[in-house]
Amino acid sequence: MATPVVLPDGKKVAIDLLSADLPDVHVMGRLPEGAALNAALPVVRVLRIGGVADVRGWADPANRDNPRFSIDCYAAAEDQAMRLAQRVCAAWELLKGRDTADGIVTGISQETGPQDRPEDPNADMARVGMTLGMSVSPPRSTS
């Protein structure tokens, strides 16, 4: 009987690597509520919005996941949110080949570039977002 391949949590890989590349930014999967969000700015939120596993052989299990993410960049002003989004895109371009304890990035994609995603007009922040993708495989074996 074949041993199933447990694919890495691509969202965790993305958050961990972006956090390392953007040490002055709070990178997370869930936003704090109310005033706590304003206090945490600048913030990058990573939401998995889809993607499927692939690279199946004739009788082999999947060994790569291809998550797609909606990435939202929050800052105090529109120009700051756009600049943060550009920094995220620049960091994303360099993720291929990097790894964490959870997995290795084997490919990246940018499906939409930074775009305005207006918040409530009464909010004291701006949001710019984009759709990014990656391919992740289980960590390399050290044995």
Question: What label would you give each PLM region?
Answer:
Residues 29-34, 69-72, 92:
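Generic detector of contiguous secondary-structure segments
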Residues 92-143:
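Acidic-leaning, charged glycine-interspersed low-complexity segments
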Residues 1-59, 100-101, 142-143:
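Small/polar-rich, solvent-exposed N-terminal microdomains that initiate assembly or binding
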Residues 82-96:
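Short, hydrophobic/π-rich interface segment
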Residues 58-63, 122-124:
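Short glycine/proline-enriched loop/turn "hinge" motifs that connect secondary-structure elements
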Residues 63-81, 88, 126-137:
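Oligomerization/assembly interface segments of phage tail-like spikes and tubes
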Residues 1-5, 75, 122:
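Charge-dense, low-complexity intrinsically disordered segments
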